[in-house]
Amino acid sequence: MSASRLERRIREAQAAGRPALIPFLTAGFPTKERFWDELEALDAAGADIIEVGVPFSDPVADGPVVAAASQRALESGVTLRWIMDGLAARKGRLRAGLVLMGYLNPFMQYGFERFVSDAADAGVAGCIIPDLPLDEDADLRALLAARDMDLIALVGPNTGEGRMREYAAVASGYVYVVSVMGTTGVRDGLPVEVADTLARARQCFSIPVALGFGISRPAQLEGLSHPPDAVIFGSALLRHLDAGGDAASFMKAWAER
């Protein structure tokens, strides 16, 4: 099977001798108007892939920063339809691969077939749905694959090798390695088990390995003898924007590492 659009973006970064950069930005944050400016700024500043968060009222896996951003977006009227329309209006203008990340409920309410069709028309390259079990994702995965889109797998410290290999049999794009059990959020350092989780993922998956949850600055990767193929950062970026910063200045620290 040939590499998907998302896998190719990460492989291109690897060929340049660096990990791919994958910022996460909640749709409609910090405001509906400014979101689109910051999305385009992330793209211009060198993001390889951008994960666009779909707001949901019960974000059980999100820490306080992402949960607050989601709530603000919902209060301002952000919907999956609004996200689709905005991305479609910018199709062809963004260099980065686009991934929609959110909980199952908004996608189910939208309708899987309609979602996949509209996402493809908007230039989306994949999606991440943390609460969609592997045993129940075959229909959506097939719909996405037919339009050259990936359903990204998530694994963590408690994911056994057997389960990883089950994911690996159907996974595409990249695998999202969760650095720590619990919710998203900024942390001072990475837990010692991260190296082991990354090593197990590399043994099981042939696609790139991306590390997320608790990543806030490049220095956190320095202690890893085998760094991930891609790094995902969200809470630190959202906090930076909420404090009045801009996406370009945040990305600069990562692009120049």
From Swiss-Prot:
EC number: 4.2.1.20
Catalytic activity reported: (1S,2R)-1-C-(indol-3-yl)glycerol 3-phosphate + L-serine = D-glyceraldehyde 3-phosphate + L-tryptophan + H2O
CDD domains in the record: Tryptophan_synthase_alpha (cd04724)
Superkingdom of the source species: Bacteria
Gene3D superfamilies: Aldolase class I (3.20.20.70)
Family: Belongs to the TrpA family.
Function: The alpha subunit is responsible for the aldol cleavage of indoleglycerol phosphate to indole and glyceraldehyde 3-phosphate.
Name the UniProt record assigns to this protein: Tryptophan synthase alpha chain
Gene from which this protein is expressed: trpA
